[in-house]
């Protein structure tokens, strides 16, 4: 007897998941979970899609990762996504890497309906000392 993996729904009804896109300047993660965030459906990184280390964070690698993730979502039965974009944050950079926008566009182009888009980068309220020393990073 075959069992259905996804949720029981009527046709045409949107089933939401959450896409956690972590875009640093070294890699891009596309991690899709259920609405609670506890159950991982698929996690793909830019590094899994390209051979060279320097291309892990590229928009192309992020696009390939997002396409893979969207295909797996459709298999499971998820048709729509809320998106949480995150940069490294903390004492490091607070701007998302180059793969964030490409991953978001690829999810939309793959036929996933987009719900809410939210920036969840951790921002320090009063943090530890930032790296670089007293006189800062000298170029």
From Swiss-Prot:
Primary location group: cytoplasm
Transmembrane helix is among the record's keywords: no
Pfam families in the cross-refs: Ribosomal_S11
Family per similarity comment: Belongs to the universal ribosomal protein uS11 family.
Composition skew (Basic residues), residue ranges: 130-139
This protein's name: Small ribosomal subunit protein uS11B
Family annotation (InterPro entries): Ribosomal_uS11, Ribosomal_uS11_CS, Ribosomal_uS11_sf
Subcellular location: Cytoplasm; Nucleus; Nucleus, Nucleolus
Subunit structure: Component of the small ribosomal subunit (SSU). Mature yeast ribosomes consist of a small (40S) and a large (60S) subunit. The 40S small subunit contains 1 molecule of ribosomal RNA (18S rRNA) and at least 33 different proteins. The large 60S subunit contains 3 rRNA molecules (25S, 5.8S and 5S rRNA) and at least 46 different proteins. uS11 interacts with eS1 forming part of the mRNA exit tunnel. uS11 interacts with snoRNA U3. uS11 interacts with MPP10. Component of the ribosomal small subunit (SSU) processome composed of at least 40 protein subunits and snoRNA U3.
Purpose of the protein: Component of the ribosome, a large ribonucleoprotein complex responsible for the synthesis of proteins in the cell. The small ribosomal subunit (SSU) binds messenger RNAs (mRNAs) and translates the encoded message by selecting cognate aminoacyl-transfer RNA (tRNA) molecules. The large subunit (LSU) contains the ribosomal catalytic site termed the peptidyl transferase center (PTC), which catalyzes the formation of peptide bonds, thereby polymerizing the amino acids delivered by tRNAs into a polypeptide chain.
Additional remarks: There are 2 genes for uS11 in S.pombe.
Gene behind the chain: rps1402
Upper taxonomic lineage: Eukaryota, Fungi, Dikarya, Ascomycota, Taphrinomycotina
Single GO BP term: translation
Any single GO CC term annotated in Swiss-Prot or TrEMBL for this entry: nucleolus
Renumbered residue ranges of the record's region Disordered: 119-139
One GO MF term attached to the UniProt entry: structural constituent of ribosome
Key words, A-Z: Cytoplasm, Nucleus, Ribonucleoprotein, Ribosomal protein
């Amino acid at each position: 007897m075959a069992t259905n993996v996804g949720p029981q729904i009527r046709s045409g009804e949107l089933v939401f998941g959450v896409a956690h896109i972590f875009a640093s300047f070294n890699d891009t993660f596309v991690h899709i979970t259920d609405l609670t965030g506890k159950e991982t459906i698929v996690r793909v990184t830019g590094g899994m899609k390209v051979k060279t280390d320097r291309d892990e964070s590229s928009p192309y690698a992020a696009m390939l990762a997002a396409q893979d993730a969207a295909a797996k979502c459709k298999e499971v039965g998820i048709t729509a996504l809320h998106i949480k974009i995150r940069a490294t944050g903390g004492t490091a950079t607070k701007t998302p890497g180059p793969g964030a926008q490409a991953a978001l566009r690829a999810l939309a182009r793959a036929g996933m309906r987009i719900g809410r888009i939210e920036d969840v980068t951790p921002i320090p309220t009063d943090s530890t000392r930032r790296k670089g020393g007293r006189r800062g990073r000298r170029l």
